[in-house]
Amino acid sequence: MPFEQHQEKIYAKDPQSIYEAALKATEKLGGKIVSSAPDQYRLTARFPKAILGKTLGERTELSCQVRADGTGGLAVVDAFPLDAVERKLMFGARPGVTLTIVTWFLAHLEHNLGLPSAP
């Protein structure tokens, strides 16, 4: 399983709404925004080892870029694990941690957009 994660999802919502939902998802999951470009619908956040009361074991950096896609928007999410001094972890990462954070982030983003949750 790769340590880095890349996912793209298309939503039938405008880019501004998707970006705002991403900000709320970051806040809900306890992430800290380290950079953002609201005019370009882009953010980068760092997440702690423990999220929603569950200890995952690694810090994670996640970036989300939203682009217009026809009548909706495309959310592009990239994430990777961080070491103790917040550098990209190149080896020794726990399997599944980064994927879990990306999955939770997208689930919260979709909830904030008012979309039904997947079964």
Segments the model singles out, each with a brief description of its role:
Residues 1-119:
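Ser/Thr-rich, low-complexity intrinsically disordered terminal regions
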